[in-house]
């Protein structure tokens, strides 16, 4: 999957969110009997058609792979995927976040100090 202008690190969370969304949709379909959705009712606003259109576009994306890859939708496969995703991308998230916050704080303090007038922020012993 290639998005122009986006960094590759942003693609992993997007793919993960799409996968979780697909699993939620499958779970809801199984709970409701997996019947196809009725056509959306007409309303005065065209914005009211958006949820129906999104569902209409998403259903084939979910049902086709579900029918072709039944092994993928099993709980074990999904748990394995989540565990691998965690180990590959989120395991050191705490240390990376702390390092980023520390560097951001230092950078912000440096910028604030550079913007501060010399009379207010000057270091030294002046009486």
UniProtKB/Swiss-Prot annotation:
It comes from the Eukaryota. The keyword Metal-binding does not apply. The keyword Secreted applies. Keywords: Lipid transport, Secreted, Signal, Transport. Residues 1-27 form the signal peptide. InterPro entries: APOC4 (IPR028120). GO terms for biological process: lipid storage; lipid transport; positive regulation of triglyceride storage; triglyceride homeostasis. It holds the Pfam family APOC4. It is found in: Secreted. GO terms for cellular component: high-density lipoprotein particle; very-low-density lipoprotein particle. Belongs to the apolipoprotein C4 family. May participate in lipoprotein metabolism. This is Apolipoprotein C-IV. It comes from Camelus dromedarius (Dromedary). The lineage of its organism: Eukaryota, Metazoa, Chordata, Craniata, Vertebrata.
